[in-house]
């Protein structure tokens, strides 16, 4: 094996097309390298919103993790957080459980025991199971129904199946469906909207809130801003849903099928002209014309302030951050900056950005974090002087890094403005150290 990290250029990828992506870029075609750069990204309990933390987005919910010790232990970090220290419970599986499946009979009893010991009755119990039960073929829906009979509150499955990560319904897609499956039909209100997609709120200064108010919306629901289970239930009063992340698409379709709430899908973008077009299209659907000039101007001014302090910016863009690495890289190139390297997972949805990158920056190198040859990655000679994403920061430890992986979600013009303000701050901090 050659001792250098495998990559393809944007031009090579675009020329071959989506059907001929090199096997090195498809994690299901080779051994997975758990790069230290992506440990938080790979571990469902380590950082950000993995399956376990996401499963507790419903107010007053608790979670029972049914797993061998090796699968459950990475939850200990989340359990130490004040808002979660009394919401995680464990049912440990031993070898006999795995061979015989006897743990399935223990689950309803465990759920009842947990609910009896809680000071406040939980709103819902999420049962998180792992690849072990995927391989056993466990019918978790049936197990949850048995548990519901014992406690008389909703019990829902939560699948932490790494095996399904590249399937039709990956774990983070399924957990979103589970979260919203608890909503009961209610009378619709014309001035209520749900924002679906994230497990934490948009940044408070996101223009989305004010633009929706321009359209006559009075109430904007986000699951993470619901104070209690009763407020969470009012999400079923929405006139329509805005889907802000593609992993919430299945959940939105469930909304439409069960609760007759239609949805409009938007993308998180870092190109200001594309953001403008997206809001304009949304306004046309809603029958309004959004006044978005002040927000766009603030974002573009932040880009120009950054350009003044770092006109020769040369970026490495990773995937462990709040954004699509290929769309963000394209935005940076269109703003006039260099992007020599991207670390990302190629999908049908983001391949369109690779095609555009191939036209503007054909020599940009694309690496896969999970490809084993990343063990030999060498940053020397890359020309990178600034990084975005935790993984990119790992590969280029001597360069300023914007981790850009905060819980509060950057979106729209506010996301662009905040990103470039952060980058400006990082560059100035490096100058002070020098």
Model-derived regions: residue spans:
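An N-terminal assembly and electron-transfer interface module characteristic of large anaerobic redox
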Residues: 1-434
């Amino acid at each position: 094996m050659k001792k250098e990290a495998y990559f393809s250029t944007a031009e090579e990828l675009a020329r071959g097309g989506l059907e001929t992506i090199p096997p090195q870029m498809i994690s299901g075609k080779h051994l997975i390298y758990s790069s230290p750069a992506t440990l938080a990204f790979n571990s469902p309990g380590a950082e950000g919103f993995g399956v376990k933390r996401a499963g507790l987005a419903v107010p007053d919910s608790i979670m029972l993790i049914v797993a061998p010790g090796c699968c459950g232990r990475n939850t200990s970090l989340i359990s130490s957080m004040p808002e979660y220290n009394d919401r995680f419970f464990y049912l440990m599986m031993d070898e006999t459980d795995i061979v015989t499946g006897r743990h399935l009979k223990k689950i309803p009893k465990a759920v009842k025991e947990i609910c009896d010991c809680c000071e406040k009755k939980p709103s819902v119990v999420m049962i998180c199971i792992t690849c072990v039960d995927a391989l056993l073929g466990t019918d978790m829906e049936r197990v949850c129904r048995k548990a519901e009979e014992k406690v008389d509150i909703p019990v829902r499955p939560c699948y932490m199946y790494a095996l399904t990560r590249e399937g039709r319904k990956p774990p983070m897609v399924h957990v979103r469906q589970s979260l919203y499956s608890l909503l009961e039909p209610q009378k619709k209100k014309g001035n209520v909207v749900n924002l679906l997609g994230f497990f934490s709120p948009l940044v408070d200064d996101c223009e989305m809130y004010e633009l929706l108010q321009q359209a006559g919306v009075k109430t904007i629901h986000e699951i993470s801003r619901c104070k209690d289970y009763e407020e969470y239930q009012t999400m079923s009063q929405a006139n329509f849903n805005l889907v802000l992340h593609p992993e919430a698409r299945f959940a939105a379709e469930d909304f439409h099928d069960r609760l007759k709430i239609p949805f409009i899908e938007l993308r998180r973008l870092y190109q200001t002209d594309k953001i403008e077009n997206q809001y304009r299209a949304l306004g046309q659907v809603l029958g309004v014309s959004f006044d978005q000039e002040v927000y766009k101007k603030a974002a573009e001014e932040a880009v120009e302030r950054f350009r003044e302090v770092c006109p020769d910016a040369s970026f490495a863009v990773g995937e462990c951050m709040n954004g699509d690495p290929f769309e963000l890289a394209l935005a940076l190139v269109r703003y006039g900056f260099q992007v020599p390297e991207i670390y990302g997972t190629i999908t049908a949805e983001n391949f369109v950005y690779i095609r555009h990158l191939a036209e503007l920056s054909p020599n940009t190198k694309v690496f896969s974090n999970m490809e084993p040859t990343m063990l030999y990655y060498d940053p020397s000679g890359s020309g990178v002087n600034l990084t975005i994403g935790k993984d990119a920061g790992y590969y280029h430890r001597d360069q300023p890094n914007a981790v850009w992986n905060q819980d509060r979600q950057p979106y729209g013009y506010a996301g662009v403005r905040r990103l470039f303000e952060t980058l400006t701050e990082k560059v100035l901090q490096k100058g002070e150290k020098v």
